[in-house]
């Protein structure tokens, strides 16, 4: 492409000014702008001929030190190697994502008098763009044009990528238009870069439309283009559009690969289209596209989330038969599923299989097993697993700690749970709502009301927001520990806040009031439930009936029973047993017998408290054996 360099430069400067950048920064030595963190080291002599490495073994350089040593050999050589050879090394380092090192090496080349060419500058522009330093990328472009280099399509595509990642998508679109105007022909890579940028900025319709525009401009989308679009659509949940694009792609000359199928299968799994994902898996297999570990892991993980652990196990066996090695994600998903299904033995067997295959468990694996041990009251083994993961340099997160703390609190070992909480804080981890709520509940269960309140106060002071479950546990604990006045203060604050109390909150307060002898207050709150948009459930009715019975207000209790039978919710075993005990204590044998018959006709039986009361009254002669027979 023959274009006037001065014309190109002029138009690019116009483009910058139009985008509100002004003239690009003037940079006497732009490499100095990479900051004090640039790579510095004295070059050691490396063994071997650098030419042979650059020619045949450049792909072997996977460590930064190897690259720096090779650069050291090159700059010691006389004459200096060609710029082409330096570019090979810089490109290899850029592929390691060590962009700062690329800039630093470029600076040292400049200091040594090794001139950069168009390709070198393009590498630098790409590095600055990848580091989201667009102004420095523009400065390099300005410098290279000042030196007489015409930017090529690769250079401008890198700049385009910089615009996309700097959240300047409108500038990116304008740059492509400017490129066309200047006589450049955007290639597949250019368009794919812009498509990716459009998806990054939630412009899915524009991204999809650009695929058709590519064809109209004589540029055919390739597998990477389609993969970018499919990935963007799946992340947005537009799975149907992704599937139609797959069909359109396969009707053309491009064959979908396992990566595209994996993307759609994973999208289907995430958006709960499990059966469609399995059908697509079968379809790809029938087309001769071999699934890989990612395919199986997505499906297994999704099946586990749906509780279909037997199907997940079948897929695991299938992949092993096909010599596709499961990875930590595959095993962890199954282990977690088995734990949640209560099949801890199977989970342990899978863990043993992981170790046998030299697959290192990750934090998710360990956390799942710790949860399993806690669920089965095997706390010592849970603690051992916790210590094992730390010894393997797999450090627990808040979820892991919270799981183990919950296990200790459940086992009424709340002090050990609190010790874990302190250890977690010392590691710099901040407990979340679940952590604090678990401890508050644990202390209330241990009848340690003071420490429960202390933990709640600490929770609020560090900025962790209580949820409605936290408040319900706090209110319930205060009420059951005879601190109704404090509970009322919290309840009134809750009603003024933006958080909506639920039916459980109201039930707790109604019960607290009734048990504290404030039945009228409880009744007032009960009657106001409908005004708050909350329908009383059977527990609310039973609580109120129990309160009336305790107060001796039999008529009000009977009235509520009648209302339940007429309007719902229907009475349950608790309703009848509460009323039967109240009538028995009042010596009303006839009413008690009628209630027992009604209860039995509804399919309910006497509970332990009722049978115990009848047995005691039978022993002291207040009842005859017929009552016990009726109950049983």
Swiss-Prot record:
SUPFAM superfamilies: TPR-like. Keywords: Repeat. InterPro entries: Pentatricopeptide_rpt, PPR/CCM1_RNA-binding, TPR-like_helical_dom_sf. PPR repeats lie at residues 46-81, 82-116, 117-151, 152-186, 187-221, 222-256, 257-291, 292-326, 327-361, 362-396, 397-431, 432-466, 467-501, 502-536, 537-571, 572-606. The keyword Repeat applies. One of its GO terms (biological process) is mitochondrial mRNA 5'-end processing. GO terms for cellular component: mitochondrion. PROSITE patterns: PPR. Belongs to the PPR family. P subfamily. This is Pentatricopeptide repeat-containing protein At1g62910. It comes from Arabidopsis thaliana (Mouse-ear cress).
């Amino acid at each position: 492409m023959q274009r006037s360099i001065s014309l190109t430069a002029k138009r690019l400067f116009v483009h910058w000014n139009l985008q509100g950048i002004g003239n690009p920064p003037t940079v006497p030595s732009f490499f100095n702008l990479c900051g004090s963190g640039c790579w510095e080291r004295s070059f050691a002599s490396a063994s071997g001929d650098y030419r042979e490495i650059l020619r045949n073994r450049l792909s072997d350089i996977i460590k930064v030190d190897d690259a720096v040593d090779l650069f050291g050999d090159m700059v010691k050589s006389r004459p200096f190697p060609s710029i082409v050879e330096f570019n090979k090394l810089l490109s290899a380092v850029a592929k390691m994502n060590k962009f700062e090192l690329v800039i630093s090496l470029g600076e040292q080349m400049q200091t040594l008098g090794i001139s950069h060419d168009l390709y070198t500058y393009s590498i630098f522009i790409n590095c600055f763009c990848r580091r989201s330093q667009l102004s420095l990328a523009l400065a390099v472009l300005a410098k290279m044009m000042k030196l007489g280099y015409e930017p090529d399509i690769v250079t401008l595509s890198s700049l385009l990528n910089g615009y996309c990642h700097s959240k300047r998508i409108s500038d990116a679109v304008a740059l492509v238009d400017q490129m066309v105007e200047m006589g450049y022909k955007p290639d597949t890579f250019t368009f794919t870069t812009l498509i990716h940028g459009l998806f990054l900025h939630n412009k899915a319709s524009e991204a999809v439309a650009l695929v058709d525009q590519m064809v109209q401009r004589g540029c055919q989308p390739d597998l990477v283009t389609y993969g970018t679009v499919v990935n963007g659509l799946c992340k947005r949940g537009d799975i149907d559009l992704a599937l139609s694009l797959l069909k359109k792609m396969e009707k053309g000359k491009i064959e979908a690969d396992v990566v595209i199928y994996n993307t759609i299968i994973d999208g289907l799994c995430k958006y709960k289209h499990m059966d469609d994902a399995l059908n697509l898996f079968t379809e790809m297999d029938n087309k001769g596209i071999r699934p890989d570990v990612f395919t199986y892991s997505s499906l297994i993980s999704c099946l586990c989330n749906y509780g279909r652990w037997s199907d997940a196990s079948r897929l695991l066996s299938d992949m092993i038969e096909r010599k596709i090695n499961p990875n930590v994600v595959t095993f962890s998903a199954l282990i977690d599923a088995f734990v949640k299904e209560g099949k801890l033995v199977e989970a342990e067997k899978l863990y043993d299989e992981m170790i046998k295959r030299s697959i290192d468990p990750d934090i998710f694996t360990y956390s799942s097993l710790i949860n399993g041990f806690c669920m089965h009251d095997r706390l010592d083994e849970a603690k051992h697993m916790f210590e094992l993961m730390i010894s393997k340099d797999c450090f627990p997160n808040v979820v892991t700690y919270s799981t183990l703390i919950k296990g200790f609190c459940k086992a009424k070992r709340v002090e050990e749970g609190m010790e874990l909480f302190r250890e977690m804080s010392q590691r710099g981890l901040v407990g979340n709502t679940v952590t604090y709520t678990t401890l508050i509940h644990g202390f209330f269960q241990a009848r340690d009301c003071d420490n429960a309140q202390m933990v709640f106060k600490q929770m609020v002071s560090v900025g962790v927001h209580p949820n409605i479950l936290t408040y319900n546990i706090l209110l319930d604990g205060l009420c059951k520990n005879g601190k109704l006045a404090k509970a009322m203060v919290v309840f009134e604050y809750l009603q003024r806040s933006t958080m909506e109390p639920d039916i459980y909150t109201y039930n707790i307060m109604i019960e607290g009031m009734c048990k504290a002898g404030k039945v009228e207050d409880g009744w007032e709150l009960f009657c106001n439930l409908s005004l708050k948009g909350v329908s009383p459930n059977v527990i609310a009715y039973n609580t109120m009936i129990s309160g009336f019975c305790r107060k001796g207000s039999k008529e009000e209790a009977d009235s509520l029973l009648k209302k339940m039978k007429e309007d719902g919710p229907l009475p349950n075993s608790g309703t009848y047993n509460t009323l039967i005990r109240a009538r028995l204590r009042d010596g009303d044998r006839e009413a008690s017998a009628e209630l027992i018959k009604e209860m039995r006709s509804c399919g309910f039986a006497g509970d332990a408290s009722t049978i115990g009361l009848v047995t005691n009254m039978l022993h002291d002669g207040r009842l005859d054996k017929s009552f016990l027979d009726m109950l049983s």
